[in-house]
Amino acid sequence: MAGHSKFKNIQHRKGAQDKKKAKLFASLVREISLSAKSGADIQYNPRLRAAISAAKFNNLPKDRIEKAIAHANNKDNYENYFEITYEGIIFDGIAIIVEALTDNTNRTAANVRAIFSKYGGNLVGTGNASFLFDRLGIIKFESKVSTSEELFDAAIELGAEDIELDEEYHVVYTPIKLFTNIIEELAQLFGYPVESYIGWRPRNTVLISDTEKAQKLIKLVNALDDNDDVQRFFGNYEFSEQIYNNLLT
């Protein structure tokens, strides 16, 4: 079992700050609509079930959830979103994988490329950064749902690969082929997770202890976080405790 560290592989996600609430809601609505295109019955659509679970956790109003599902199943709706993955490299071998959901791939590609370029990085071809990561299922529970031992034992019994723990969340990593089954089994024991998705986990991390480089990296990930099309991103870096205390608290 891997102990989770706040300095390890910090993943910047759409924040809960007031100034980002509208953007977070828009992201949740898009994910629900995209998921619902595969069917509106959550019993047979685990991705939609996970999207609704995340929306409820983040207090997306019920009427907006229902409208997002209806929007996806409206035959007169011609709005199409595409899921795109970008891979980027910056200094010291740091790799970042960006997952976007967009209705304009040219716009999103240009914006993501500009962000990397501005802070000393470049987009690279498929596989040139992702080989540094494992692709797997990621299931995130609030830590209050169970003791770490209970969740660990249950998840490992079901075939999970690893678990990271901290005071706020328990994160379960699963093989993709077992992802849906493990969600369902754990949900029966602990309730549905805060969020669940197929994502990326670095095989090794690069320690950032230089202040100037850390500042540049933070600006880059903040710019990604501020982009409406970016859903998630994953990096193979970790900040030293000194950098974390000086710049991130």
Swiss-Prot record:
Q: Pfam families in the record, alphabetically?
A: TACO1_YebC_N (PF20772), Transcrip_reg (PF01709)
Where in the cell is the protein located? Cytoplasm
GO terms for MF: DNA binding
InterPro entries for this protein: Integrase-like_N (IPR017856), TACO1_YebC-like_2nd/3rd_dom (IPR048300), TACO1_YebC_N (IPR049083), Transcrip_reg_TACO1-like (IPR002876), Transcrip_reg_TACO1-like_dom3 (IPR026564), YebC-like (IPR029072)
Q: What GO biological process terms does the UniProt entry carry, in alphabetical order?
A: regulation of DNA-templated transcription
List UniProt keywords, sorted A-Z: Cytoplasm, DNA-binding, Transcription, Transcription regulation
Superkingdom as given in the UniProt entry: Bacteria
Q: Its GO CC terms? A: cytoplasm
Similarity remark: Belongs to the TACO1 family.
Enumerate the HAMAP family for this protein. Transcrip_reg_TACO1
Q: What is this protein called?
A: Probable transcriptional regulatory protein OTT_1378
